[in-house]
Regions:
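Domain-level signal for soluble alpha/beta catalytic cores
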Residues: 1-211, 217-376
Length: 376
């Protein structure tokens, strides 16, 4: 099968666009990752790795933050939600040594996470774990056709994950590292991706069900990181005919004003042919403590605040953000790029995203609160 793949003629651009559509489904909704499709946003927030409070809540059986994160990301425009089960249960570990092993914890936790997310929102899921048992437990619990995250070029991982991809007929994220680790050489990363596509073909898995992560390096540590990934994405598209994804925020790691870097990187990656990203689609709500501190600061400066001012009005007036999660600036950049690349016909999504809800009493009025009607 791999030899057949190697000998196939390169398809035309039009045929390539039609062929390379990765279909991910929930029970009721479909997300398509493709060269001629709007950019696919995979929300990353349901991940206890590095989120101590979330991990502690999950250990107590409290899934309220997972539900809230799912709803907020879907509302912000995420097309797929990544669900990661990599939690460390420190308290249970002290009582039962089995909890020190992720191979014990994650196969139990993953189905619970998926059930909570599926009950909260109706968009497709990306099952994310380094534990094959957790991946299969997630596949059993998931409705529709989820995206599996992930396989690598490591021999053991290939032999464990690709049979699951074939058995459940699902697409998979392929990360471009192998048994030698992560190479800084983009040519090596391309060869790893090619190896995964060829091995997948041996299992009867088509290239359109492989979504390659070419591994975005931090530009603060490697000045050529951006240029490398753009070149690599073009090669993956033209030579292997696969869709691509990345951890978008990796590019700005360790830098000030990370949103500024991310906002530039994402449209440029889209222009190079990247078709999806695993990213945070929301701007977090302003912390109540910060609101209280700012109010105290203003009062100390002799500024009198109206008694009737609510927190949302307060933070809006001061440019602090919102008391509710809102779509992040990266989502604005992606929607603009979709429009500019002709993946948003007539700018429908751009207009909907930027439409300001009328204030109370202003419904049905034109600009500046005028009543509708022809100017005389």
């Amino acid at each position: 099968m791999a030899d057949l793949l190697r000998n196939q003629p390169i398809p035309s651009k039009e045929r390539l666009n039609t062929m390379t559509r990765t279909v991910v489904e929930s029970k009721t909704k479909t997300a398509i990752i493709g060269f001629d499709e709007p950019f696919c946003v995979i929300g990353e927030r349901i991940n206890p790795t590095g989120r101590k409070i979330l991990a502690e809540e999950l250990e107590r059986g409290d899934f309220s933050r997972v539900e809230a994160d799912a709803i907020a990301q879907a509302a912000a425009g995420a097309n797929i939600l990544d669900v990661n089960s990599g939690a460390v249960f420190s308290n249970k570990m002290a009582e039962d040594p089995r909890y020190a092993d992720n191979n014990f914890v994650e196969p139990m936790l993953m189905p619970e996470l998926i059930r909570v997310v599926q009950n909260a929102v109706d968009i497709p899921i990306c099952i994310d774990s380094s534990v094959p048992g957790a991946l299969e437990a997630g596949l059993e619990a998931c409705e529709g056709r989820p995206l599996l995250n992930s396989v690598t070029g490591e021999e053991e991982r290939l032999e464990l994950v690709l049979p699951l991809v074939k058995k459940y007929n699902v697409p998979v994220v392929a990360i471009s590292n192998d048994d030698t680790g992560i190479s800084e050489d983009p040519d090596v990363r391309f060869e790893v991706a090619k190896k995964i596509v060829e091995r997948a073909a041996d299992f009867g898995i088509p290239a359109h069900d492989i979504v390659v992560d070419p591994l975005v390096m931090p530009i603060g540590a490697m000045a050529t990181a951006g240029h490398q990934v753009f070149t690599l994405v073009r090669r993956l598209r033209e030579e292997l005919g696969v869709n691509t994804t990345c951890g978008a925020s990796n590019i700005s790691f360790g830098l000030p004003n990370r949103h500024g870097i991310n906002n530039a990187f994402l449209p440029m990656a889209m222009g190079a042919g990247m078709t999806s990203a695993i990213m945070n689609p929301i701007t977090l709500a302003v912390n109540p403590t910060k609101i209280a501190e700012k109010k105290a600061e203003l009062v100390a400066a002799g500024i009198i605040l109206p008694d009737e001012i609510d927190d949302e009005t307060f933070v809006t007036l001061l440019g602090m953000g919102s008391t509710k999660p809102t779509p992040g600036k990266e989502m604005e950049a992606i929607r603009a790029a979709n429009f500019l690349f002709d993946r948003d016909p007539h700018g429908t999504e751009w207009i909907k995203f930027n439409k300001v809800a009328p204030k109370a009493g202003q419904e049905g009025r034109g600009r500046a609160g005028r009543k509708g009607g022809r100017r005389r």
